[in-house]
Amino acid sequence: MVYSHSPLKVALMALLSILFALGPARPVPAQDQKIARYVGTSACKPCHEKEFKAFTSFAKKSSSFQSINRLRKELTAEEIKACYLCHTTGYGKPGGFINEQLTPDLKNAGCEVCHGPGEFHAKTQDPRDIRGDLTEEDCEACHTSERVKAFRYKPLIRGGAH
C-alpha cells in the first residue's frame, strides 16, 4: 500500500501531535491578558525608597532627558525620536513617554526602562509582575557596542545606583 502525504499535511499532523502532547491550556489570569503600562519611577518610591533615593541621586539616566535638550537644536525630529527610545521611559509602547507635557513622569530613563512596565507590580507588589534580576543582555537594547564606543561608556548591571 502506498501513502502520499503533502508537506502541508505532514506539518499539520506534527503540529496537532505537539498540541495534543502539551495537554489542555491553563486559564490565563486576567492580568496576563492585557499589557502592563508604564507608571513612572515615582510609583516605585513607596516600597523601594532606598533604591529610589540612590537612583535619583546617583544614576545619570535618572536625568537623561537633559541630554536630548542639550542637543535638540542640532537634531532632526526623527533623530530626537530615536533618542527617546533610550533616554525616556517606554517611548512608543502602551502607557509610555509621549512628550514632556503629556507624560512628564516618563521623560527620563526611569526604573521601568530596565525592569519593564510597573503597572501590575505597583498594584500587587508581586515580584513575578516585574523583571527583577537583570543581566547584561537587558542593558544591550540601549548600551550597544556602537554606543559604548561613541560615548565611551559601558553597561553596568548595578549602574542604576542600586
Language-model regions: role of each:
Residues 11-23:
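Bacterial N-terminal signal peptides
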Residues 1-8:
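N-terminal secretory signal peptides that target proteins for export/translocation
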Residues 27-135, 151-162:
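Sequence context of c-type cytochrome heme-c attachment sites
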Residues 2, 22-25:
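Classical N-terminal targeting signals for secretion and organelle import
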Residues 144-151:
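Short, exposed beta-strand-loop hairpins at the edges of beta-sheets
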Residues 136-143:
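A contiguous, mid-protein "functional segment" used to position or interact
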